[in-house]
Amino acid sequence: SRSSAASDVYKRQMYHSERGVYEHKMGIVEGGKSALLASCGPMGLGAISYMLNCNRKPSLLVITDIDEVRLKRASELFTEEYAKERGVEIHFVNTAKVDDPVKTLRDLTGGTGFDDVSVYAPVRPVIEMADEILGFDGCLNFFAGPVDPKLSAMFNFFDVHYKMHHLVGSSGGNTDDMKECLKLAGEGRLDPAVMITHIGGIDAQIDTILNLPKIPGGKKLMYLGKNLELTAIEDFEEKGKTDDRFKELAKITKEHNGLWSKEAEDYLLANF
C-alpha cells in the first residue's frame, strides 16, 4: 500500500548524521521540519496520514501542490486542529499561486530550511525546488517513480559538500511496513479511505484499467462480486436523485467526512 511505502521511507530510507560522527541515524528528524511536495494525490494523502499518525513525527509539516481542488480537499481531511492534536503544525501551500515558492516555503521554517523533503511528482522543477529548501543535513527523498529513464535535475553539490545535503529514492515498503500500517489502521490512527475517490463493480473494471490515466481522482475500489459502473464518491448525491441507493451512500459518506467507510461498504454489499 502507499502508506506502507511511506512507512519504509520515513523510518528506514531517510537518514541523518552529525559532523564528525560517522553513523547514520535512520528515519526523519523527530520533532524536525518536513515538507511533502506535490503531495495531494492518493500517494501523498497516504503519506500525510502516516506522517501525522506514526510514532516518529515532525513538529512542522508543509504540504504543497498546484491543484487547488486537491489542496483544498487535503486541508479538509487533515485540518490544522487535527494536526495540532498530534503535536504537528501543518501548512498547505499552492506553489503556483506564490511569487517565490522557495522563499515562501523556507520562511515557514524560520529561514533554516527543512530537515526532510519528499517529492511526490517526477517533475524537474519540483525536484529542484526540494533541493533549494533543504536545511543543514537535509535529506531529499525522491518518492515518485519516474517513467522517463532520462529524467534529471540540477542538484547543488556545494550544499552536498558543505551542508551535508543528501538524496535517497524509494522502492516501496516491505512486509514489516505493511504490518505496521495495518496495526495503525486497526487502532484507528491511519485511514486508508483518504486515498479512495471512486467505487465500481466487475463490469467497470476493464474500462477503468484501460482508461486509468484519463480518470481523475485517487484510488478506484472495485467490488468484483457486483455489477456497478465506476462512480466518483462526489457524484453519489447527483446519482441519488434517480437511485435511492446512491442517495443513502451519499448520506453515509457525508457522515464520514466525504470518505468511503465500512458502513458504506456494508450498505453496498447488501443493496447492490
Regions flagged by a language model, labelled:
Residues 1-6, 10:
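Single conserved hydrophobic/aromatic residue that forms the stacking wall/gate
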Residues 14, 21, 99-104, 128-132, ...:
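C-terminal hydrophobic helical "lid"/dimerization subdomain
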Residues 20-34:
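Short helix-loop-beta connector
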Residues 40, 48, 52-127:
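Adenosine-nucleotide cofactor-binding segment
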Residues 43:
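Hydrophobic/small residue at the entry helix of a nucleotide-binding pocket
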Residues 54, 132-136:
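Conserved helix-to-beta-strand junction in the class I
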Residues 59, 138-139:
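Glycine-centered, small-residue-biased loops immediately flanking beta-strands
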Residues 144-164:
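Rossmann-fold NAD(P)-binding glycine/threonine-rich loop
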